[in-house]
Amino acid sequence: MVRVFQQHVPNSNIVETNTLYKGDRYTTESHRETLKINGWDFFPVDIMDENGTVMLPVRNGKHFQEISMGKNIVNYDSMIVLTHFKGHAMGGYGGSMKNIAIGCADGRIGKSMVHGVSVDNQPADWGQWPSKERLMENMAESAKAVVDYFGKHIVFINVLRRMSVDCDCAGLSAAEPTIPDIGILVSTDLLAIDQASIDLCICSTKQSRFSRTY
């Protein structure tokens, strides 16, 4: 799918940011090595916070007036958001909203702002977890900053297959997929595609753990 995209989108890059938690993608150097090990080096990859951060405004935000993103995001005028849809222990689900809310936020400041209880836009200490409701509101505001920045030049693709109740960040400890493969959804509306994905998961099996949990 990625190869096909790049054939039809001239001068495109895959964009990433480093992680907040220590691991194989914590630094730019280890991140690039991880991409290489996993065979994801057949296209240009821009680790957007490699050269620093930039603050994007959150218009009419409840918790944030602005949020920290990987600096290189401002080098782009459009974005295709490709997301593996799944569950999430704190956010309820991991869809396009979470993908851009966490995925575009830089690995130190922005991700800490979203995950922590921030005061005056200052990130909280790692591990000072907010309530699930606050985390989801933080993610919504971070995603809004990205959507507002790109305007009409952003499209979302949710892949509904091999869906676990756990986020991909759980790695090998993630629960085995419990929801039947459904297909691929595409939309220019962030809320519509994530809501449709949730509805399809719940309707696919009312007895699934995903449905009972979320």
Predicted features and spans:
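Extended, low-polarity segments enriched in aliphatic/aromatic residues
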Residues: 1-214
